[in-house]
Design a protein with these regions (language model features):
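N-terminal intrinsically disordered, low-complexity segments enriched in P/E/S/T
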Residues: 18-146
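Sec-dependent bacterial lipoprotein signal peptides
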Residues: 1-16
């Protein structure tokens, strides 16, 4: 019996050592692309671009305007027909120009009272007074569609 337990323990340790390691930065980097231009951002990078606040459902978020983020990435937001936000779990949300050019649409990296909640990830879209499906959490990529 002891021998079987020992073999199972060694097998379990071996399998756990062979498991792929998760990239520690996964989810802490935001990719912005239009298919030709691609730029990545950390929360510190976004803070440099300017800070605005927007409130949704009683929570005040801090972030950067989406159109400012596009301009920094070398993408002219006025030439886009749509924008797609992609979350780490594969969820996507699509926006038309009236939404993504709005002054209060932002990519949030914090709340006014501190960091984003753990279930929000490092970044999220905030489009005030819209349904939850247009405010994805765990944002990892923004695709600009010409």
């Amino acid at each position: 019996m002891k021998r079987i337990l020992f073999v199972l323990l060694v097998l379990a340790l071996t399998l756990s050592a062979c498991a792929p390691k998760q990239d520690a930065s996964f989810g802490n980097i935001l990719k912005v692309t239009d298919g030709t231009v691609e730029k990545t951002y950390s929360a510190d990078d976004l803070k440099i671009l300017g800070e605005i606040q927007a409130s949704d459902k009683g929570v005040t978020y801090i972030g950067v305007q989406l159109k400012v983020l596009f301009q920094d990435a070398g993408i002219d937001p006025s030439t886009l027909s749509a924008v797609k936000a992609v979350a780490s779990d594969g969820f996507t949300a699509n926006y038309d120009p009236s939404q993504f050019l709005a002054d209060d649409m932002l990519v949030a990296y914090a709340r006014a009272d501190g960091a984003l909640a753990e279930d929000e990830g490092a970044f999220r879209i905030v489009l005030p007074d819209q349904g939850g499906k247009l405010n994805p959490r765990m944002l990892v990529e923004i695709d600009a569609i010409p």
